[in-house]
Regions:
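N-terminal leader/linker segments that precede catalytic domains of diphosphate-processing enzymes
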Residues: 1-62, 66-122, 130, 151-153, ...
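Amphipathic alpha-helical blocks and their helix-capping loop/short-beta junctions
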Residues: 126, 130, 135-157
Length: 190
């Protein structure tokens, strides 16, 4: 029998409110969705559709995107983008808190990660921006080897730290957010 993930432990180690924005950069937010019932706690990741001109084309990430003028705040951005991209209505689930603001490697966008726990099973409905959804058990993230690799970015090529999860390369913003999550003391929990 698999243990249930300890949501109270995670909630106690997150920021209770949205992280502080730097006024000089555009903002976006993502939803770090935890399924506490799946293999002792799993995280939802997506593969973005490959599109010309999209700097995140084909990359592994979290549901999320840029803040729209109609969004009341970054939390609403994460909720809206998750509903649009994968069909999960986060209002029906539990907001655990936030992680600190993360800036993209190009320093063009700052991203607020909000952490949610599912209260029930969900059926994914991907839109055109997403080609794949998958769950990564936290216990497996703790065992993945961090490797340096060269990736193609808008500016050319960049040497980055990354995880390889079943042939899916997790690097950049997603890699840093996952490390922030694991750095909340969860590595000893799973």
């Amino acid at each position: 029998m698999t243990e249930r993930f300890d949501l109270a432990l995670l909630k106690g180690r997150l920021l209770p409110d949205a992280p502080v924005e730097l006024q000089r950069l555009p903002v976006a937010s993502v939803a770090v969705v935890v399924n506490p019932e799946d293999r002792g706690g799993s995280i939802l990741l997506i593969r973005r559709t490959e599109r010309s001109g999209d700097p995140w084309s084909g990359q592994i990430g979290f549901p999320g995107g840029h803040k729209s003028p109609e969004d009341q705040g970054l939390l609403q951005t994460a909720i809206r983008e998750t509903r649009e991209e994968v069909g999960i209505i986060l209002d029906r689930h539990e907001l655990l808190g936030a992680l600190p603001m993360v800036t993209t490697h190009s320093r063009r966008v700052q991203v607020a990660p909000f952490v949610f726990a599912l209260k029930s099973d969900v059926a994914m409905q991907m839109n055109r921006e997403v080609t794949e959804t998958f769950w990564v058990p936290l216990s497996e993230l703790n065992r993945l080897d961090v490797k340096s690799r060269e990736v193609k970015v808008e500016e050319g090529r960049l040497e980055v730290d990354s995880f390889d999860y079943g042939g899916r390369i997790i690097w950049g913003l997603t890699f840093r957010i996952l490390n922030l999550l694991l750095g909340r003391g969860l590595e000893g929990h799973v």
